[in-house]
């Protein structure tokens, strides 16, 4: 017994010695060449340049999208029913805004590239009241209304809230809801420009569709909406270099929003869920969803509101999403045309997706196939061109929502 124990121990000791020798040799391995060693200060300086360029690139993408979207939001107020608001066409933020925009950056990194807690203009939509006044990216609000900003976001937000309240009261007076109708007020502002000069202006906001247009840094060639805002993916913006093509996609997503497709789809999901599962099986459906829901959705290509069982989402997506997509294409054509977009090539915009996904020509489960979309969009374009030739307002046929009275009157005249 003793000899066996010592023999085993000896073998184990030899094995451990071999491992130690191997680790030691690995630890001693070093490069063979004398490559240049860059001082840490230079590395950090180069990193700041790259980080600043990354933020600027994201702001450039945002500027491109919002410049494309601005005329769509302005010219389609008549179709946006209750979703309207007064806007200056300006985005102001601070270091926390940039940290949110540049996902993955720390607040310290954002501060190092030149942003702090004070408000600064991040974007101005081309053609907006702010742009026409001469405000640019990098401008700093000094005084808004009668409020000195002093680098405080709270002061800026308070001044804008006061102006909004004042303007709403004036609108009520103009509508005759209260006595003493008056002209709508403008907002006097002072901005310090990037060159150090001061700009004074009186800003009169424009009533637009209140639909935020955002940029997602995802690489997918895609865009989507959650029902109230639009997300344009970086991959799509890189893929589509023509702004009119991008505008067609933005208009399509706006079509989903003003068509109220997300709440309708959510309501359909709840209804179909009750039909498919019934109240007693709701718990079982949720358990089923936990195991198989995601796989079913991937198979069906469904991306619908959360909160329902997977089979319900798939059933609703397959049966209902195509019709909403068809309507978004149709409404989107009107949105684009009213916004001044060249729609002559619109039917070919979505054909680009067939190059990325050949099954879109025959096997799409939640969208119309590419050939069908092309033909339907072509028909919508011809319908719009006929209305233009006849001098009619560009309003989708059988539009179910109210439009401004002046457009109702004009529509009555053309009919």
PLM regions: where:
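Post-HEXXH active-site segment of zinc metalloproteases
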Residues: 151, 156, 262-290, 347
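Bacterial N-terminal signal peptides
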Residues: 17-26
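Short beta-strand-turn/beta-hairpin segments enriched in glycine/proline and small hydrophobics
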Residues: 100-121
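Catalytic Zn2+-binding segment of zinc metalloproteases
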Residues: 236, 241-245, 254-271, 341
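C-terminal capping/extension segments of zinc metalloprotease domains
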Residues: 4-5, 11, 28-95, 105-112, ...
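Short pre-active-site segment immediately N-terminal to the catalytic Zn-binding motif
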Residues: 129, 231-248, 318
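Conserved PDZ fold ligand-binding element
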Residues: 130-164
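Substrate-binding clefts and substrate-entry loops adjacent to catalytic sites
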Residues: 233-235, 260, 281, 285-323, ...
């Amino acid at each position: 017994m003793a000899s066996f124990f010592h023999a085993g121990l000896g073998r184990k000791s030899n094995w451990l010695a071999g491992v130690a020798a191997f680790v030691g040799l690995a630890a001693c391995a070093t490069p063979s060449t004398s490559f240049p060693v860059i001082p840490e200060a230079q590395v950090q300086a180069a990193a700041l340049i790259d980080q600043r360029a990354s933020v600027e690139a994201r702001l450039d993408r945002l500027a491109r999208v919002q410049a494309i979207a601005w005329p769509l939001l302005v010219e389609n107020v008549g179709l946006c029913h209750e979703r309207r608001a007064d806007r200056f066409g300006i985005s102001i933020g601070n270091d926390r805004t940039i940290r949110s925009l540049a996902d993955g950056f720390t607040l310290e990194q954002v501060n190092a590239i030149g942003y702090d807690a004070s408000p600064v203009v991040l974007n101005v939509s081309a053609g907006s009241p702010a742009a026409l006044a001469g405000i640019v990216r990098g401008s700093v609000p000094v005084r808004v209304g009668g409020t000195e900003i002093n680098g405080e976001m709270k002061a800026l937000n308070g001044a804008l809230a006061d102006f909004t309240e004042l303007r709403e009261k004036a609108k009520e007076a103009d509508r005759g809801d209260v006595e003493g109708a008056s002209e709508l007020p403008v907002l006097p502002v002072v901005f310090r420009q990037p060159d150090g000069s001061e700009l004074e202006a009186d800003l009169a906001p424009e009533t637009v569709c209140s639909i935020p247009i955002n940029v997602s840094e995802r690489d997918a060639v895609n865009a989507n909406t959650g029902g109230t805002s639009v997300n344009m993916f970086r991959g799509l913006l890189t893929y589509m270099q023509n702004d009119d093509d991008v505008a067609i996609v933005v208009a399509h997503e706006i079509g989903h929003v003003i068509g109220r497709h997300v709440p309708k789809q959510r309501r359909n999901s709840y209804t179909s869920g009750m039909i498919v599962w019934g109240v007693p099986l709701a718990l079982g459906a949720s358990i089923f969803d936990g195991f198989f829901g995601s796989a079913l959705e991937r198979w069906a290509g469904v991306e619908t509101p959360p909160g329902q069982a997977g089979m319900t989402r798939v059933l609703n997506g397959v049966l209902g999403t195509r019709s909403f997509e068809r309507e978004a294409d149709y409404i989107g054509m009107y949105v684009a045309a009213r916004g001044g977009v060249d729609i002559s090539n619109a039917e070919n915009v979505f054909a680009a997706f067939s190059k990325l996904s050949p099954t879109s020509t025959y096997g799409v489960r939640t969208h119309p196939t590419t050939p069908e979309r092309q033909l339907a969009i072509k028909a919508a374009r011809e319908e719009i061109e006929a209305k233009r030739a006849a001098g009619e307002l560009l309003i989708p046929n059988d539009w179910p929502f109210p439009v401004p009275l002046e457009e109702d009157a004009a529509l009555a005249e053309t009919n």
